[in-house]
Amino acid sequence: MTTQAGHEEQPLRLRNFHITFFAIVLGMAGFTLAIQKGGELFPVLELTSDWLLYFTLGLFGLVSLVYLAKAVSHPDTIRKEWNHPIKINFFPLIAKIFLVLSVVYLERNMQISYYAWVTGVVLQLLASVFIISSWINQSHFKIEHMTPGWFIPIVGAIIVPIAGVKHGFLEISWFFFAVGIIFWIALFTIVMYRMIFHASIPDRLLP
């Protein structure tokens, strides 16, 4: 009985492995970058940033493999997340991870930084096009669904120029930065309207 219950519990856990878990990886990537920059002032942090980078890469691989397993075994849950008015905004986290890692590797390996940046830019562009199209075309989105999480797809566009300029892609960097700023202003206006004239945002959805 215990064995059978365990086998039934494992698929349930996999179904509940949401796209939001990539936020942990993004947080670690950002923390690694902060420690790496701190190493310029405090050399003792240089070794710490190396270990943090290895840990972040391992965590990224682990989360990606688990989520890929979920996509293969439970594709219906992926579709539900994509159609969810809040969770859909967390898919660009993957692009942001690549973009932040491209900044981390600027001082370590320019070639790895370049490939990470290109991957992040492609994923960011695809995510932005599909998600913004979803915002415009979906009829089930309501003002109550507007949360700070809606900024996630846009913030990625603003990150692009950090490594993009170093790699010589000035025009592409300006394009993403301009798109990010324009949509950030639009979303900020909508969020302020939602906070003033509608019910307050739940605490669990606040940054």
PLM regions and their residue ranges:
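Hydrophobic, membrane-facing alpha-helical anchors
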Residues: 1-14, 62-78, 121-138, 183-195
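Alpha-helical transmembrane segments of multi-pass membrane proteins
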Residues: 28-37, 63-67
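Structural signature of hydrophobic alpha-helical transmembrane segments
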Residues: 50-65, 111-125, 171-186
